[in-house]
A protein has these predicted regions:
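Active-site and donor-binding regions of nucleotide-sugar-utilizing enzymes
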Residues: 10-19, 24-31, 37, 44-60, ...
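Short hydrophobic beta-strand element within catalytic cores of glycosyltransferases
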Residues: 43, 273-275, 290-299
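A nucleotide-sugar donor-handling region in carbohydrate enzymes
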Residues: 139-203
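Donor-nucleotide binding loops and adjacent catalytic segments primarily
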Residues: 187-270
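Acidic donor-binding loop of glycosyltransferase active sites
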Residues: 268-279
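A short, well-ordered alpha-helix in the C-terminal region of glycosyltransferases
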Residues: 357-373
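C-terminal alpha-helical cap of glycosyltransferases
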Residues: 372-386
């Protein structure tokens, strides 16, 4: 490890809790390395390790300032079980309290307990990534990157009285490095639309959306070049995978993608996006892609509502409750944002911009103001100052 400060990052990812914790922690880790810190990931099992390494570039795997360690006594859903091992690890090689307290320990787990945090406090500076507000966390640094309307900010601040310092709001969103400092321009016409449901699509949204798209927009006789291209991101657990690829062969304006390595580049080619709520909304926000969201799981409801309340990303509703209404609202959004639906000037030489272009430009600026892609570096700088 390097001579600068060492940060331990305790997190996990597996088929039960997905990979979101690993992805956002890796983004923070990469920025910690930029600041001169060394990083040690502490994981529960080989599954978490394999998942983490699948997100790492070869150069990152070879970086001597980053290491990955499996805890022998850990269970991802029972953190207190590992306490003796973690305390021994954090205390090893230190002869004084000042040396011990120079450790930085970032935790990202929904299975945190007050006892776990309190037990570690004497041997490290503790930081915690939160989005559930389970209790008032006794930590040195609390990070919650929810989209928080001004009216809700006081209640968030009141919920974290035991934290010595609190970082609140979307400015602290830890996005993947591919989204850092990336900008896109708003085109005059809508020619490309991104559609994504995340890793799975249990309610067959993509298939329903495409059927509606073909029926409503791809009307018989309409020139193919005037139809926006649909870019469908096919998650690894999508049960309709084969059907979606078949539709891509049948219709030239439908393209399906799987295992996308540079999502920022794909998003950057699109003028509009339709997305299930979740981390993807923050990524689209950072690029300024006008987006409409929908929900299909309980843990997506709060995020979708928060984006909707700020006016940044409207939510069409919950696909589980009223599929037809949700899809109709999504098409209303596409119409509103597409030039085809505007009443344009009768003068073909007019350089007046379309109303839909102005709406997309306004949305782009609003989204970029909310999430700029530098959240992980802001967190890294705060961790180094602990």
């Amino acid at each position: 490890m390097g001579s600068d400060r060492l940060i331990y990052i305790r997190t996990d990812g597996n088929s039960k809790i997905a990979a979101g914790h690993l992805v956002r922690c890796l983004s923070i880790a990469q920025n910690c390395l930029k600041t001169g810190m060394s990083v040690c990931f502490l994981l529960s099992d080989e599954e978490s390790k394999s998942l983490l390494e699948s997100f790492m570039t070869e150069s990152l795997k070879e970086n001597q300032q980053l290491s990955v360690q499996l805890l022998k006594t850990a269970k991802y859903n029972d953190l207190e079980k590992e306490l003796p091992e973690v305390i021994e690890l954090l205390s090893a090689g230190h002869s004084s309290y000042n040396e011990i307290s120079s450790n930085v320990y970032l935790l990202d787990s929904y299975f945190v307990t007050k006892r776990y945090l309190s037990a570690l406090h004497p041997v490290a500076k503790i930081a915690y990534l939160d989005d559930l507000q389970l209790f008032d966390y006794p930590v040195d640094l609390l990070i919650n990157y929810d989209v928080i309307p001004d009216t809700a900010r006081p209640s968030y601040e009141a919920a974290y009285q035991n934290a010595k310092k609190v970082l609140l709001g979307a400015a602290y969103t830890p996005l993947r490095r591919q989204f850092e400092n990336k900008t896109v321009s708003i085109k005059e016409n809508v020619s490309d639309i991104l559609v994504t449901t995340g890793g799975s699509d249990p309610y067959h949204f993509c298939m329903e959306f495409i059927r509606k798209f073909v029926t409503v927009l791809a009307l018989p006789g309409k020139k193919v070049q005037n139809i926006p291209t649909l870019h469908i991101v096919v998650g690894s657990l999508n049960e309709d995978k084969e059907s979606l690829y078949a539709l891509s062969k049948e219709y030239p304006f439908i393209r399906s993608y799987e295992n996308v390595t540079d999502m920022a580049a794909l998003m950057g080619t699109c003028d509009l996006a339709v997305s299930a709520s979740g981390t993807t909304l923050y990524e689209l926000c950072s690029l300024g892609i006008p987006t409409v969201s929908f929900t299909m799981a309980d843990n997506q409801l709060i995020s979708a509502k928060a984006f909707d309340n700020t006016g940044a990303i409207p939510c069409a509703g919950d696909i589980r409750k009223d599929r037809e209404q949700v899809i109709q609202k999504i098409f209303d959004f596409i119409r509103q944002m597409s030039q085809d639906m505007d009443t344009l000037s009768a003068d073909p030489t007019s350089d007046k911009r379309s109303a839909s272009y102005e709406r997309r430009l306004k949305a782009h600026q609003s989204l970029r103001n909310l999430v700029d892609g530098d959240g992980a570096m802001r967190i890294a700088n705060e961790l180094k100052q602990l």
